[in-house]
Amino acid sequence: MWTWLRGSGDNEMRVTIHQPQFLPWLGYLDKIDRADLFIVLETVQFKKNEWQNRNRIRTSEGWQWLTVPVLHRFGQRIHEVQINPTAAWREQHLRALEMHYARAPFRDRYLPDLRALYERPWANLSELNLAVIRWLLQAYGITTPIRCAGEFPAREEPTDRLIDLCRTVGATRYLAGPGADHYMDKPRFEASGVALEIQSFQHPTYRQVYDPFEPNLSAIDLLLCMGPEALSRLRDNRPTTLDAVGASR
């Protein structure tokens, strides 16, 4: 039995589990910040045209994608997906970030470290995403520990997998995203003895490099605009309670 209590009272432990996203948005970081342990779900199928190899940044015309080109086969798991070595994605991303965030107040504080991360010899998408997530959490000041699902035994069916991961690490609560209805058998999960909570995320507003405000961008946007105040801005807009489903423990 693994125990990862991080200041939760009464021996409660909240775990959240999610696929590794590239330059994830604020809702992703909010969910990690609320948890005592974050498990990266890199063992499930890669989904093309979602958020595992792309995200959005602010531009003068609205927003644009930053996409990591990949080589993958249908049914391939995220941790098996390789980055296309012939594409110049690093240069394109860095050029876009430096151009569109040239007037961001904290550009010089964070972009050099992000550039150094980009310039490492990446071949595997999951490894890149995990490094980017770790960098973002450190830059924000989010201290939630991270483990990978591949470290633990778990069944393949989606709800069974979540139950197994929660039980293995000793979780008493599982924090799911708002889309839990689409992938979870809630009654069966609640019967496992782990309390189910649903994230309620309210997107913060803040001064961006361009007007009007554009929500749902990569978390790099808030970081470059507000710097050390980014985490408090994220937390200030947070509902005081989570939505609990059921009363099982």
Describe each region flagged by the PLM.
Residues W2-R249:
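Residues lining hydrophobic/aromatic ligand-binding pockets adjacent to catalytic sites
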